């Protein structure tokens, strides 16, 4: 079933495979995604007036804020960009201005749409690539005009086609004409002059277009290059750009991380270099404006913005009132417990345990984690979080890496062995480090 047609229940169930707990946040993003589908069912002109309800996630680091947004975008197959709010400065200061968010999102959508189109025409491109390679191996007869005549394959050509498909001539060298790749030209222009930059790029690209070079390469490499070339010929660039821009405008998701860092705190004195300025620059983007990109104008009216922050030193009310109003849905995420850590390690798809088991399995080392080993690992990670900085589930990465450090280093020497990770093994490897506050702070 397409993600666009999934009900909120189904979306939450899909997110549950990767993220433990945080049901309120999952429900909020599931409804936001479902509302996009609902909006598409509404007739114009009312459809245009329905705007997405942006979400503000509040919670400490490592509890799943970013992962929820990333998994949602993957589920919806939507253009998605994660950016740090602290990377941007007010227009007029040295640094990136907020319009680059939409430009980067559009670049991502172009890439995503191009990959989709290339897959769609790939079978035709492969047929054309086969013919071009066979032309180099068994040239077809030429007509009176000197052009190759296409007809039924002769027996030699049929034999080579069969061997090509079976991979029996992959290492054979052939001489073939390959299109020269266009030089990567990046024209630097001031904000607002992207159209001029695009014209310059087009001019330089036009100089290099249709240039071919004869190369002597193996059939395997030639096939890949020609398939790419033939697929690119079959993709209409104008249609691709139009589809990509529509995809950004209707389905784009922007994840604004660390938004609490640009909130001006009451007790802070000094110039506050452009904190409020960045917030004011974000306002039109979130509210709905038109941004000029190298591919055309992009409207942001229906792009979904998800902001997140720990809000340890600032409060959501420290954001300027206008920006607060642009994020009507607020969700607080809970800190993770030791029980949550157990679930993260054992229940999620692509859990850390599955990842490390697969990695060491490539060297024929079999890892077996017992229930008490997993629980002890979770308890130690939770304990270190309690006594030092609480970095949430990210602590599991450092603890797991330390646990398997020696085993990973000596994996080739342990080939064919079965290693059982139980509570005793975890204590042997980690108890001393986790027990000492100083060591835990700097090692874990």
Curated annotation (Swiss-Prot):
GO-annotated biological processes: protein unfolding; proteolysis involved in protein catabolic process
Cell compartment(s), UniProt: Cytoplasm
Origin: domain of life: Bacteria
Annotated binding of ATP, by residue: 20, 62-67, 257, 322, 394
Keywords: ATP-binding, Chaperone, Cytoplasm, Nucleotide-binding
Recorded GO CC terms: HslUV protease complex
GO molecular function: ATP binding; ATP hydrolysis activity; peptidase activity; proteasome-activating activity
Signal peptide range in chain numbering: none
Matching Gene3D superfamilies: 1.10.8.60, DNA helicase RuvA subunit, C-terminal domain, P-loop containing nucleotide triphosphate hydrolases
Quaternary assembly: A double ring-shaped homohexamer of HslV is capped on each side by a ring-shaped HslU homohexamer. The assembly of the HslU/HslV complex is dependent on binding of ATP.
Function: ATPase subunit of a proteasome-like degradation complex; this subunit has chaperone activity. The binding of ATP and its subsequent hydrolysis by HslU are essential for unfolding of protein substrates subsequently hydrolyzed by HslV. HslU recognizes the N-terminal part of its protein substrates and unfolds these before they are guided to HslV for hydrolysis.
Assigned protein family: Belongs to the ClpX chaperone family. HslU subfamily.
HAMAP family in UniProt: HslU
Alphabetical list of PANTHER family matching this protein: ATP-DEPENDENT CLP PROTEASE ATP-BINDING SUBUNIT CLPX-LIKE, MITOCHONDRIAL-RELATED, ATP-DEPENDENT PROTEASE ATPASE SUBUNIT HSLU
Protein name according to UniProt: ATP-dependent protease ATPase subunit HslU
Organism expressing this protein natively: Bordetella parapertussis (strain 12822 / ATCC BAA-587 / NCTC 13253)
Name of encoding gene: hslU
């Amino acid at each position: 079933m397409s993600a666009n047609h999934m009900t909120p229940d189904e979306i939450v169930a899909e997110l549950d495979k990767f993220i433990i707990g945080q049901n309120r946040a999952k429900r909020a993003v599931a409804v936001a995604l479902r509302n996009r589908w609902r909006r598409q069912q509404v007739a114009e002109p009312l459809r245009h007036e329905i705007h997405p309800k942006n979400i503000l996630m509040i919670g400490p680091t490592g509890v799943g804020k970013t992962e929820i947004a990333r998994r949602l975008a993957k589920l919806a197959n939507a253009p998605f960009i994660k950016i740090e709010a602290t990377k941007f400065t007010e227009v007029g200061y040295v640094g990136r201005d907020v319009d680059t968010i939409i430009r980067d999102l559009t670049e991502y959508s172009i890439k995503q749409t191009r990959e989709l189109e290339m897959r769609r025409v790939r079978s035709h491109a492969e047929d054309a690539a086969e013919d071009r390679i066979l032309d180099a191996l068994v040239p077809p007869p030429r007509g009176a005009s000197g052009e190759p005549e296409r007809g039924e394959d002769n027996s030699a050509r049929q034999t080579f086609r069969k061997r090509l498909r079976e991979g029996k001539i992959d290492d054979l060298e052939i001489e073939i004409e390959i299109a020269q790749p266009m030089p990567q030209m990046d024209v630097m222009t001031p904000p607002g002059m992207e159209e001029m930059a695009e014209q310059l790029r087009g001019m330089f690209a036009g100089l290099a277009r249709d240039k071919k070079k004869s190369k002597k390469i193996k059939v395997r490499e030639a096939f890949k290059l020609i398939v790419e070339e033939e697929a690119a010929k079959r993709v209409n660039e104008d249609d691709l750009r139009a589809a990509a821009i529509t995809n950004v405008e209707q389905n784009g998701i922007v994840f604004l991380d660390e938004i609490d860092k640009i909130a001006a705190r009451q007790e802070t004195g000094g110039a506050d270099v452009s904190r409020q300025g960045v917030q004011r620059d974000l306002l039109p983007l979130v509210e709905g404006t038109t941004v000029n990109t190298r591919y055309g104008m992009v409207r942001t009216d229906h792009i979904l913005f998800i902001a997140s922050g720990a809000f340890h030193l600032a409060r959501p009310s420290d954001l300027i009132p206008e920006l607060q109003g642009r994020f009507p849905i607020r969700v607080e995420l809970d800190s993770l417990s030791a029980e949550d850590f157990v679930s993260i390690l054992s229940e999620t798809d692509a859990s850390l345990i599955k990842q490390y088991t697969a990695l060491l399995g490539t060297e024929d080392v079999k890892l077996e984690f017992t229930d008490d080993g997993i629980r002890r690992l979770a308890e130690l990670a939770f304990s270190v979080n309690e006594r030092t900085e609480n970095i949430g589930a990210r602590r599991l990465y450092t603890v797991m890496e330390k646990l398997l450090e020696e085993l990973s280093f000596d994996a080739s020497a342990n080939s064919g062995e079965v290693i059982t990770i139980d509570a005793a093994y975890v204590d042997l490897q980690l108890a001393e480090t986790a027990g000492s506050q100083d060591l835990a702070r700097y090692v874990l």
